[in-house]
Amino acid sequence: MGKYSVLMIFIASSLLIVLQNVEIVNAVGCTGSFFNGNSSYAQNRRDLFSTLPNKVVTNGGFYNSSLGKSPNIVHAVALCGRGYEQQACIRCVDSAIQGILTTTSCLNRVDSFTWDKDEEDNVSCLVSTSNHSTFGNLELRPSVRYQSPNSIEPSKNMTLFEQEWNAMANRTVESATEAETSSVLKYYSAEKAEFTEFPNVYMLMQCTPDITSQDCKTCLGECVTLFKEQVWGRQGGEVYRPSCFFRWDLYAFHGAFDNVTRVPAPPRPQAQGNESSITKKKGRSIGYGGIIAIVVVLTFINILVFIGYIKVYGRRKESYNKINVGSAEYSDSDGQFMLRFDLGMVLAATDEFSSENTLGQGGFGTVYKGTLLNGQEVAVKRLTKGSGQGDIEFKNEVSLLTRLQHRNLVKLLGFCNEGDEQILVYEFVPNSSLDHFIFDDEKRSLLTWEMRYRIIEGIARGLLYLHEDSQLKIIHRDLKASNILLDAEMNPKVADFGTARLFDSDETRAETKRIAGTRGYMAPEYLNHGQISAKSDVYSFGVMLLEMISGERNNSFEGEGLAAFAWKRWVEGKPEIIIDPFLIEKPRNEIIKLIQIGLLCVQENPTKRPTMSSVIIWLGSETNIIPLPKAPAFTGSRSQSEIGAMSMSDDVFTELSCR
């Protein structure tokens, strides 16, 4: 048994290593309606596919064509990466076509695209088809991504790595979009760089040549953002869209870097010299008397520092009696400190809480815009004096947000609790809150479908972090459009954690007599029975999602909420009725998919609602099967009677967070 066992272990280990490094060779994404396999459309597509590989080569690497007449016309685009060999390009395009024809999710779908790659031939290529012309248009969806199975080692300095990686991504985007040539392969860039802790990092970007330079920059930027939001921390990854693709890795690929000069790592900070300050410039030692003088001065300084420490510690000890922020000592996950702001500093920043700096009025106080001495803009929430609930909110926000850090959560910079003042200082988010856009007829027109999709996905990621990915398990309890802030790039940030509830890691549900939240967004089991779980937040998310799609407030429908109205239209087979008129020309299938997700989130039975991790998977995939929803809350007689019987005080919490 001995030598055979060793041999089997060796073979199994080798196979495991191979499987871990196997790459998926093509990225296929399909959307749109279905067509009959025996239809004229199907025949036109087959005929177009039969000549496409050779046409790409004879046209310099990029080819756009159409065949047939409406409604059976087929449009196709094909592209081979720069530096290709002709036969390699032909094989790649043919492989891409086979991927479209054989992928289960693409069978007889009208819109399809694939970025195929052949590591052996060192070539990548694109093939896309549709029943409408995409030539010259920026196409961002569907998107497909892959990531390395391996994570970056925990011992690496991720803050430094991210800074260097961001700089490399920005350089590559700029280089790819310069388009100094009129070549059909003009939007292309390959870069090789040395990082402080990695000898070689490789990055490749390319766009189809039919779009503008600005569209190319937008497409590549969306690829980079998607990678960072979904799989950051991996040792490589790829994102493919119909108009562009992006890939980076720790090893060379596609033969794209053979003639690329490596960008050196940024200079490290200069080390301090070893020469003693007690030595004179000309190398002569300071005399005995000089040493005595230095010792005396240093001793005096130490005494002053000690006295100052005692005074500061005394003040802090008094403050700690008011609020306990745990053992974090005001340090967030980036190693930056949570500041205890001096009241004078806050007064100076807000011009003594000038009414001209008022951003809004909330349930527990007023929010002001402020500017610190270093020029940083902040949002300052001054809680109402003597408010018992405000005191609870203050302690809750500080104790939770000192330990949370995520791109889709608002960042608490510090606080002040001098005398009877309770003040929270946040990062300033310039675009106010989501409700200012989605419920305003004029501003809502600025929210494109792509922007709304990104906002919805960002909110979902923030919730996933709270429920599953952070060191804590937190239920927000007051999710609504006015508690979603939008930064300068319209990225969402979940805000207002005053009513949030901290769960133990193994705790899934709790009960409370203190109902905190806003009517219309609260799950029925929480509103009626005080039952709290992650599914309570999922319900609120579903309401917001439906508001984003319809552009209407949840309470805009007399006699029934938005969820009930959407459910009735869904059962009637007319879900498009609830779609915002500003979105009527947008991808209908995607919008209806999100209506379906929203209805799943607001189902009456909390166990039937999805987790936020499932929502993220559905949002990012074109191929996953999404279950059909059941009836939402408050649509049956049982729910209606519960509404009439339920007891609720005016415990409706803050309608405005820091903005």
From Swiss-Prot:
Pfam family, one: Stress-antifung
Boundaries of every Gnk2-homologous domain copy: 28-134, 142-253
Catalytic activity: L-seryl-[protein] + ATP = O-phospho-L-seryl-[protein] + ADP + H(+); L-threonyl-[protein] + ATP = O-phospho-L-threonyl-[protein] + ADP + H(+)
InterPro entries associated with the record: GNK2, GNK2_sf, Kinase-like_dom_sf, Prot_kinase_dom, Protein_kinase_ATP_BS, Ser/Thr_kinase_AS
Topological domains annotated Cytoplasmic: 311-659
Protein kinase domain mapped to chain residues: 353-619
Source taxon at top rank: Eukaryota
Phosphotyrosine PTM positions: 426, 526
Predominant location: membrane
Residues spanning the signal sequence: 1-27
Modification Phosphothreonine occurs at: 518
Membrane protein topology class: Single-pass membrane protein
Location in the cell: Membrane
SMART domains: S_TKc (SM00220)
Positions annotated as glycosylated: 38, 64, 122, 131, 157, 170, 259, 274
Residue ranges, Extracellular side: 28-289
Class of this enzyme: transferase
GO molecular function: ATP binding; protein serine kinase activity; protein serine/threonine kinase activity
Annotated TM spans: 290-310
Residues recorded as bearing Phosphoserine in the entry: 482
Keywords associated with the record: ATP-binding, Glycoprotein, Kinase, Membrane, Nucleotide-binding, Phosphoprotein, Receptor, Repeat, Serine/threonine-protein kinase, Signal, Transferase, Transmembrane, Transmembrane helix
GO CC list: membrane
Family that this chain belongs to: Belongs to the protein kinase superfamily. Ser/Thr protein kinase family. CRK subfamily.
Protein name in the entry: Putative cysteine-rich receptor-like protein kinase 39
Protein source organism: Arabidopsis thaliana
